[in-house]
């Protein structure tokens, strides 16, 4: 929105500078984007009258004139403008004048003829007007008056950026209202009376879409002179707001648009057949617009039409068939309230954006239409003459917006602002904003104004109070609070500690989308149901993940496609499992997942780089589990999973309950995904391992430890982990360490069996153990493994 500072000051004129005014506007939430002078820097230019105008004797394109500038004699001035003529009021730069660009006017001769000044065009004075030739001033312009004073050129054009909710400030009236509120000044609105009808002509209105157009006004004005010039003051105000003067009818409707924020339109009455219809377009209808383009109308487009077809796109663009031109004698003025949702997006649908659509789709004051009609009628009769008919209105009260009533609690206001504003001041602010307000029991009940569509909730009222009270008036007080140390159990394991351990093991943390490709997810987890998004970002991201593995495998593939063969990634996050018994029908589980592929170690001169295997990943996971309280109770139990290699996969169990899985990606799946080499993954429930071992001091034994090595022959199906657990259980407190150091199958061991070599370390804190005591521990271990696994000592 661009507006003239002087125009606003006609409505409200606070005793502040331009800079201070812009600061106020910005702090009101109407951000000032720029300020520029409406004219260049010049002096010595006055209003003159061309008394004589003759052809230059030696130049076809020059004229010799005598100009009256109010002095004791006429000035001889040579002019090359084609529109220079006798009787014209002009802008005359006299001797000594300085024009933009430090161009000084001196007496000179042009092709032998004396010239004592210059007749100026708009561009020569730094005024942005598209016009050929010199400036043509009104015939009543007082001769000798300084042009800057006559045209009020000591003015600034201020441009502001408005958020979509502040459509009420897309007008001089709205901006002045805000400035008046913050400066505690009354706004001086232009005074005009309702124009009485002098002719009986009426316009019939057929309001077929009241939900889209709850209020529609038309008025006939006959015998207008559309060739009458728009007054200079109107042209200048339009120009300073960025609108070019076209003809008096268009200029007047644009003027009302800028002054009140009410878009209006004018039809040529001779081209309209009554009744005028307000309806939605029919499929296949077309409309030739005022710019000559043809719009193929869609059924969601609101139209102004008659029995012959569309006349205009309601609230967006007029049609050429009913447009006003130089031959127009009678006009029909339109002023309406179109529902924002009926206009929103329609202009963009046709590649258009107009001042009218910009306002209607944000919301125009629904009480403004009649006032704007009266103002436009007054101006039109003053400028173009004519006779006005009665204002014809069709409206639907049930579809008109209702002003909102919102309550504001004193406690909420104080809490959000962090500052106490006197009750009377708050009430006064609401009154100055034009709201109706009552206060009782520490609650303000506020009814907003018809021009404020954005007042809907309590926070909106708090924003209004803060804006008008002044953000800079709210002190910068640090918040006061009673601090309490956050409880932290010593047994809680910080997730950051786990992440650090994995980073130390040469892993990198990944963050993948919670939305995954349902095809890939069903490939990995065919028996798990996934949540499908109703409005996904894309087809490839239309399901919620039931595991983090699909995202990590995607990251592996992404890296491999970029020549990164060694990949070690981990991720923590939620997986989403449909569960009718869970809140909202979905169980959200926080898990830790990891993936490795490529070589176990980076390339190095000291050794050959070997590919990763199952036990590399298992070892890394065991290192993580060693930090947890239940790590020594975790078991890896062979189990098959859909996504994993049947011979290289295991369930992760804690106290017999499955909390995760580990293994190699199934070769067929790896091939379908395009993965290179073997890829190993694990996923484990974080909550199951989120406790850590609380450090307990233990006395270090001063007595020697004794080691005994046993080679136990067991069936192939016996897990080594279960055998070791049985040894620890049978050995009691004196058995301080059990370690598996060899697995053998071959000569000397029957087929279907394996030899597990384990070391048993026996020690006591109180004394040196005798052989009998050591042998007792060993015998207890042998008896236990014999009973549970039918283990035999290897010969």
From Swiss-Prot:
Its EC number is 6.1.1.20. Binds 2 magnesium ions per tetramer. One of its GO terms (cellular component) is phenylalanine-tRNA ligase complex. Residues 401-476 form the B5 domain. InterPro entries: aa-tRNA-synth_II/BPL/LPL, B3/B4_tRNA-bd, DNA-bd_dom_put_sf, Fdx_antiC-bd, Fdx_antiC-bd_sf, NA-bd_OB-fold, Phe-tRNA-ligase_IIc_bsu, Phe-tRNA-ligase_IIc_bsu_bact. Mg(2+) binds at residues 454, 460, 463-464. GO terms for molecular function: ATP binding; magnesium ion binding; phenylalanine-tRNA ligase activity; tRNA binding. GO terms for biological process: phenylalanyl-tRNA aminoacylation. It comes from the Bacteria. It is found in: Cytoplasm. It catalyses: tRNA(Phe) + L-phenylalanine + ATP = L-phenylalanyl-tRNA(Phe) + AMP + diphosphate + H(+). It holds the Pfam family B3_4. Its main location: cytoplasm. Keywords: Aminoacyl-tRNA synthetase, ATP-binding, Cytoplasm, Ligase, Magnesium, Metal-binding, Nucleotide-binding, Protein biosynthesis, RNA-binding, tRNA-binding. Gene3D superfamilies: 3.30.56.10, Bira Bifunctional Protein, Domain 2, Ferrodoxin-fold anticodon-binding domain, Nucleic acid-binding proteins, Phenylalanyl-trna Synthetase, Chain B, domain 3. Residues 39-148 form the tRNA-binding domain. Its cofactor is Mg(2+). Residues 701-794 form the FDX-ACB domain. Belongs to the phenylalanyl-tRNA synthetase beta subunit family. Type 1 subfamily. Tetramer of two alpha and two beta subunits. PANTHER family: PHENYLALANINE--TRNA LIGASE BETA SUBUNIT, PHENYLALANYL-TRNA SYNTHETASE BETA CHAIN AND LEUCINE-RICH REPEAT-CONTAINING PROTEIN 47. This is Phenylalanine--tRNA ligase beta subunit. It comes from Haemophilus influenzae (strain 86-028NP).
């Amino acid at each position: 929105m661009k507006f003239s500072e002087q125009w606003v000051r006609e409505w409200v004129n606070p005793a502040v500078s331009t800079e201070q005014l812009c600061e106020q506007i910005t702090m009101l939430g109407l951000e000032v984007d720029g300020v520029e002078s409406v004219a260049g820097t010049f002096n010595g230019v006055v209003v003159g009258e061309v008394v004589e105008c003759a052809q230059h004797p030696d130049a076809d394109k020059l004229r010799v004139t005598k100009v009256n500038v109010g002095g004791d004699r006429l000035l001889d001035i040579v002019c090359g403008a084609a529109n220079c003529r006798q009787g014209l009021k002009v802008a005359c730069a006299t001797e000594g004048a300085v024009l933009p660009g430090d161009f000084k006017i001196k007496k000179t001769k042009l092709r032998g003829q004396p010239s004592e000044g210059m007749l100026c065009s708009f561009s020569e004075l730094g005024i942005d007007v598209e016009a050929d030739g010199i400036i043509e001033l009104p015939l009543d312009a007082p001769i000798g008056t300084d042009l800057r004073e006559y045209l009020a050129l000591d003015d600034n054009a201020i441009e502001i950026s408005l958020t979509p909710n502040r459509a009420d400030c897309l007008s001089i009236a709205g901006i002045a209202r805000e400035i008046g509120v913050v400066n505690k000044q009354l706004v001086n609105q232009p005074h005009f009376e309702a124009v009485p009808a002098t002719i009986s002509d009426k316009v019939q209105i057929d309001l077929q879409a009241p939900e889209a157009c709850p209020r529609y006004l038309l008025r006939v004005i006959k015998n207008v002179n559309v060739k009458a010039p728009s007054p200079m003051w109107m042209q200048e105000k339009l120009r300073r707001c960025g609108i070019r003067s076209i003809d008096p009818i268009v200029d007047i409707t644009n003027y009302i648009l800028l002054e009140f924020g009410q878009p209006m339109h004018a039809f040529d009455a001779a081209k309209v057949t009554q009744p005028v219809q307000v309806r939605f377009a029919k499929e296949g209808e077309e409309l030739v617009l005022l710019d000559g383009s043809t719009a193929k109308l869609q059924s969601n487009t609101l139209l102004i039409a008659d029995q012959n077809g569309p006349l205009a796109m309601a609230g967006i663009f007029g049609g050429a068939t009913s447009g006003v031109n130089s031959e127009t004698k009678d006009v029909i003025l339109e002023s309406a309230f179109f529902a924002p949702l009926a206009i929103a997006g329609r202009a963009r649908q046709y590649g258009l954006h107009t001042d009218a659509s910009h306002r209607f789709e944000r919301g125009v004051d629904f009480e403004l239409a009649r006032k704007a009609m009266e103002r436009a009628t007054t101006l039109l009769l003053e400028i173009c003459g004519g006779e006005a008919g009665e204002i014809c209105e069709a409206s639907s009260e049930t579809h008109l917006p209702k002003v909102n009533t919102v309550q504001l609690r004193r406690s909420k206001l104080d809490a959000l602002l962090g500052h106490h504003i006197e009750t009377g001041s708050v009430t006064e602010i609401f009154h100055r904003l034009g709201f109706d307000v009552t206060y009782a029991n520490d609650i303000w009940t506020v009814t907003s104004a018809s021009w404020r569509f954005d007042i809907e909730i309590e926070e909106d009222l708090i924003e209004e109070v803060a804006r008008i009270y002044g953000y800079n008036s709210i002190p910068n007080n640090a918040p006061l609070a009673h601090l309490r140390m956050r409880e932290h159990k010593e047994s809680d394991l910080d997730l950051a500690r786990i992440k650090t351990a994995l980073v130390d093991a040469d892993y990198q943390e990944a963050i993948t989308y919670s939305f995954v490709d349902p095809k890939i997810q069903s490939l990995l987890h065919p028996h798990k149901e996934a949540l499908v998004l109703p409005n996904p970002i894309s087809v490839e991201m239309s399901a919620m993940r039931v595991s983090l593995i699909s995202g990590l495998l995607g990251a592996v593939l992404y890296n491999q496609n970029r020549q990164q063969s060694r990949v070690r990634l981990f991720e923590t996050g939620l997986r989403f499992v449909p569960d009718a018994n869970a809140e909202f029908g979905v169980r959200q589980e926080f898990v830790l997942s990891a993936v490795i592929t490529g070589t176990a170690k980076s390339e190095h001169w000291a050794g050959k780089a070997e590919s990763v295997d199952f036990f590399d990943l298992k070892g890394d996971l065991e290192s993580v589990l060693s930090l947890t309280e239940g790590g020594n109770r975790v078991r890896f139990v062979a189990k098959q999973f859909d996504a994993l290699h049947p011979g290289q996969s295991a369930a992760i169990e804690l106290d017999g309950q499955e909390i995760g899985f580990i293994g190699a990606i199934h070769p067929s799946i790896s091939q379908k995904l395009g993965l290179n080499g073997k890829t190993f993954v694990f996923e484990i429930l974080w909550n199951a391992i989120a406790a850590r071992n609380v450090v307990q001091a233990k006395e270090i034994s001063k007595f020697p430890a004794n080691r005994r090595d046993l080679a136990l022959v067991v069936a192939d199906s016996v897990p080594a982990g279960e055998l070791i657990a049985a040894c620890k259980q049978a050995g009691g407190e004196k058995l301080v360490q059990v370690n598996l150091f060899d697995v053998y199958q071959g000569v000397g061991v029957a087929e279907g069996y394996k030899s597990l070599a384990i070391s048993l370390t026996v020690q006591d804190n109180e004394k040196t153990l005798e052989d009998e005591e050591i042998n007792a521990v060993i015998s207890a271990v042998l008896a236990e493994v014999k009973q549970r696994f039918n283990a035999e000592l290897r010969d």
